[in-house]
Regions:
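Membrane-embedded alpha-helical segments of multi-pass membrane proteins
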Residues: 37-46, 84-85, 178-181, 261-272
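Periplasmic/ER-lumenal interhelical loops and adjacent helix-loop junctions
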Residues: 120-193, 243-254, 258
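Hydrophobic alpha-helical membrane-interfacial segments at the cytosolic entry of transmembrane helices
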Residues: 65-68, 100-125, 140-145, 208-220, ...
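Hydrophobic, aromatic-rich transmembrane alpha-helices
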Residues: 114-118, 180-207, 211-224, 276-279
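Membrane-embedded helix bundles of polyisoprenyl
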Residues: 1-96, 109-124, 296-305
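Membrane-helix boundary/interfacial segments in multi-pass membrane proteins
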Residues: 30-37, 142, 165-174, 219-268, ...
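Membrane-interface junctions at the ends of membrane-embedded or membrane-associated helices
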Residues: 6-10, 51-64, 92-107, 191-204, ...
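Extracytoplasmic
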Residues: 139, 298-447
Length: 447
């Protein structure tokens, strides 16, 4: 963000403050469980390259944009879609201004777009094929559930130190308060971009930037409201722009949380705030500007400060599991599956299984996602059917799963399993001796 804001304003002070604001967004407070949502740092780098290309015509800058855009999208698939909106806005506005003097831009931009699409074919093809083959898509009702209300931008995370007891608390995906300092400076930047600058800057160029980033804010805001935009819980329309795009853009039905389009709001506000900082700085004495910048940086940091409530993980290891994983670590590489596949508290225990791969180093069938694979669903369906383990083991062998780990102590009396299932299932697997290379017992864990 420092690069982008500095290149736009010509001021290192404005760039530094924009970088601080973007790094300390209050939005971060609820996103520790979804670290991939915080991987938005390539956006300003890409836009920096994009602006440089339009201002200089250098193809190296266009390459920087393309690489940063791809890195951003591959870091988080949501941003392939949402960040594309920002790129389209900047590209459209800049082309309207510059294409008449440099028509070759159209050819260069088209060639770059084709190369970017070609580089994404392996990932996009796999993504779309898996989605089609396993019917992996997010329903409209899910999108509505994870959309932001218009007032969510004044709802604070309960983790925020400064605002949690003052502002209304929002849901984890809908606590979108950007901070009053950022909002104020962005408003000053938007208005200031249409005024005459004392240092002789091109007022048309500054106005163009102000309009561009305001459009990015507006688009992000509208998209974050999801298929059925609401204000204070009141339905504004039964079908909004996100709903229209949902039906025509390939792969968009794989996104669950429209509220994450708010990153465009924060991106646009930060750039506008940088313009606002520079606008005020040119109106003040150097000493006053320095004090003001220092105070503003402190406010950005204070508004974005939060206290994370983390649960210690992993818990104290169970000796039998530890012994099983120690043994597994010494074995040749091969796929592994750990039973029960739906232990008590599925999310926490499945994550424990995934965490165990750091110890035993074997690739794991188990995993947690918003989606369930057909393999996991099949195993869940037949896990308690001891007569099905002959076919189950044959299927796992066909998939080159080499190790099966069973923890008897993780079977509990629940709706989907009973405490007595562990020994029964262990016996059913051992009865398939002709399909087993070896069996090892570690307390209440079998491998």
């Amino acid at each position: 963000m420092y690069l982008l804001a500095t290149s736009i304003t010509g001021s290192r002070a404005a760039g530094l403050l924009a970088g601080i604001a973007f790094a300390f967004l209050p939005y971060r407070a609820d996103k520790i469980p979804h670290l991939q949502v915080l991987m938005y740092g390539w956006m300003p780098v890409a836009l920096w390259g994009f602006h440089r290309y339009f201002s200089t015509g250098h193809r190296l800058a266009l390459t920087v944009f393309a690489v940063a855009f791809l890195l951003q999208g591959l870091s988080n698939g949501y941003f392939f879609y949402f960040f594309s909106a920002a790129v389209i806005v900047i590209g459209f506005v800049e082309l309207l201004t510059r294409v008449w003097t440099r028509p070759r831009m159209i050819v260069e931009l088209a060639a770059t777009a084709v190369l970017m699409l070609v580089s994404l074919i392996p990932v996009a093809t796999a993504y779309l094929n898996v989605g089609a083959n396993q019917a992996l898509s997010r329903s409209r009702s899910e999108n509505i559930m994870f959309s932001a209300d218009a007032l969510a931008y004044f709802h604070a995370s309960p983790n925020l130190v400064l605002w949690r007891d003052i502002l209304p608390q929002g849901a984890p995906e809908a606590s979108l308060f950007p901070g009053f300092a950022l909002l104020t400076m962005a408003l000053i930047g938007l208005l200031g971009s249409f005024t005459k600058w004392r240092d002789g800057r091109n007022p048309y160029a500054m106005a163009r930037l102000g309009v561009s980033y305001f459009l990015i804010v507006l688009i992000g805001f509208v998209l974050s409201l999801g298929p059925e935009p609401t204000y204070a819980g009141t339905l504004l329309t039964e079908s909004g722009p996100y709903d229209w795009l949902y039906n025509i853009v390939p792969g968009l039905d794989g996104l669950r949380v429209p509220a994450r389009a708010a990153i465009l709001v924060f991106l646009g506000l930060t750039v506008l705030a940088a313009i606002g900082v520079e606008r005020l700085r040119t109106l003040c004495s150097p000493r006053l500007a320095g004090v003001g910048c220092f105070m503003l940086a402190a406010i950005f940091i204070a508004e974005g400060s939060y206290q994370a409530k983390l649960i210690p993980f992993p818990q104290t290891p169970i000796p039998s599991e530890q012994a099983a994983y120690d043994w597994l670590e010494q074995q040749p590489p091969g796929g592994a599956i750990i039973l029960p596949i739906r232990p008590r508290d599925p999310i926490v225990n499945t994550l424990r299984y995934v965490y165990s791969t750091l110890q035993h180093r074997q690739p794991l069938v188990n995993g947690y996602s918003g989606y369930g694979t057909s393999l996991i669903r099949s195993i869940e369906t037949h896990e308690r059917d001891v007569s099905a383990y002959g076919d189950l083991l044959r299927g796992l062998r066909a998939l080159q799963v080499r190790y099966l780990v069973l923890h008897e102590h993780r079977y509990e009396d629940q709706a989907w399993m009973q405490q007595t299932d562990g020994p029964l299932i262990s016996a059913a697997i051992r009865a398939q001796a002709h399909q087993l290379v070896a069996h090892h017992r570690f307390g209440t864990s079998d491998v």
